[in-house]
């Protein structure tokens, strides 16, 4: 099991110390959908911790290729379903950087309804 899998397992359990232990202290994680950039592991973990309200975190797929790991997760959050695609780079067995993109189910409406 790699650091990304351990991170998401810890997020699912809301085990914030275990989640933080998977990241380098100065890991850079970007959330382009909100224009957030977390330059320290503690800031990224705090953002997750303060969000709260999750009833289920289901990691559907993890793909590893050397130091690069991708994850696809589905999150039930206070009655809404969110999807996360994450791309991470590992260094010395920890997450050094990553980009996570979240979208809410149906957030943009159906393509057919936009005509």
Write out the residue ranges for each language-model feature:
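A solvent-exposed, acidic/Ser-Thr-rich amphipathic alpha-helical stretch
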Residues: 16-65
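Residue-level recognition of short, well-ordered coil/turn positions
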Residues: 15-16, 94
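Alpha-helical interaction segments
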Residues: 5-7, 21, 34-35, 78
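Short, aromatic-enriched amphipathic alpha-helices that serve as compact interaction elements
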Residues: 1-15, 22
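A beta-strand edge to alpha-helix "cap/lid" segment located at domain peripheries
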Residues: 46-115
């Amino acid at each position: 099991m790699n650091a990304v899998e351990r991170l998401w397992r810890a997020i699912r359990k809301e085990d914030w110390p275990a989640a933080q232990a998977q990241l380098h202290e100065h890991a850079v994680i970007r959330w382009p959908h909100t224009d957030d950039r977390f330059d320290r592991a503690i800031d990224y973990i705090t953002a997750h911790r303060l969000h709260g309200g999750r009833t289920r975190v289901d990691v559907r797929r993890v793909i590893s290729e050397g130091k690069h790991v991708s994850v696809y997760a589905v999150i039930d959050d206070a009655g809404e379903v969110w999807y996360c695609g994450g791309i991470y780079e590992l260094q010395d067995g920890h997450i050094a950087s990553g980009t996570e993109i979240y979208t809410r189910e149906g957030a943009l409406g159906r393509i057919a309804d936009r005509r």
